[in-house]
């Protein structure tokens, strides 16, 4: 234990020989490390209870790193698998999404992945996990169950589940294997000659899959492309550059990294000839498109190669590097900022590290103007702003509570599980839809369950009422407040009818995924996707497309 503590303290005390620091900084570092060392020695010697060095010092390390930014993280030896999963998108397990069932207060199967162990042994949406290798999973959290489902590739365990639709329990032997999270869950043709690629993670080998998908789409007759980066949180920079290279000529600068040290600086260029540098493209982005997604969308925007459509991206312009530590740990730390071809950095938050460090959002008024290759104006900070802003439909409050696992009766999950049990097969994914009678049955279930949820109008009315009382105006407007309360009181039937289409689409999407997995859910949802519809509309109008990328200069 003392050896572990000594090693951890030496890591903290170490000052890189290559760092060019002034004497004041050097003194402050040595002084505070000495204080830290002295504090822990006194704690270890005098504290009333015996301390766990790994826990106490580990908490200190984590607190220090949290004060810098959300991406700088310490991974001790026992968490190295977590880091590997993050970097590769791979883990050893059963290949299924699990969730907590609030009605039964147990963890259940939410979505088995296609061609993975969970699906192959017959596990279905809603199956309740009772035990793993005879260890009872009652009252266990999702993270606990997840840890027990994972293990070494090739290892087997006995899984006991209960199927809610029949009430029967079943015991199956499951063999874990390496699971590659689907980074390209679906690609195919939209209307006419428009190809579509749904891409959700820049992990190892993902560029090869995108290349294969794009070539296949061209063989199918694709003359234009919708490339969907919505909810893609990023990943490998090299994979991003390889994908960008499919659409940009050889020799183009895509990315420049700039850090404190010379070795952190790097320029990425397209290295080979592209597959297609002229095909019209629309790239879809949203607020969850981050990092490598912003490198790709921003680079294509800066070279006027594609129209970016959707909502402003996340704004992560920082680069992380992993470094080895003693005792087989690693630290993932921010070592550079990246700049896309126009010279801008998309970082939205400024992490201040001076006295009393704080986080500051870069306001639009302080952003700088940059220019694309064709002279269009773009700005730094705050992510990549789309050329065409199209906001998705807002999630109705009742749908949020039904689908957001806040319903203690689990009305939506139970309806879906029962529907799946009654229907061995359904229509093809892109054609499937629930009938009005199906929705009426769901509506009846919701009403019988005495479903409760908060309405935003009621919440704001209560806040307004409190404010009126505080300022002394409530008595004068009491009658109006009472009338509004009656008008805005809960009417679940009305809300279910008013939001029928949206809720129906949520149900259809969940049900389809049980038969056709993630690819089917994507196909089904595309029928109602406002942003995809706008992308198709734009690609079907070459003059509008050209007007955006090459506007007439005044």
Roles of regions detected by a PLM:
Residues 345-554:
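Conserved functional hotspot residues or short segments at active or partner-binding sites
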Residues 18-32, 36-53, 76, 85, ...:
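Cleft-lining beta-strand/loop regions that shape enzyme active-site pockets
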Residues 1-26:
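Bacterial Sec-dependent N-terminal signal peptides
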Residues 44-82:
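N-terminal, post-signal-peptide region of Sec/Tat-exported proteins
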Residues 292, 304, 311, 315-376, ...:
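Polar, glycine-rich mid-to-C-terminal structural blocks
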Residues 71-111:
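PDZ/PDZ-like peptide-tail recognition elements
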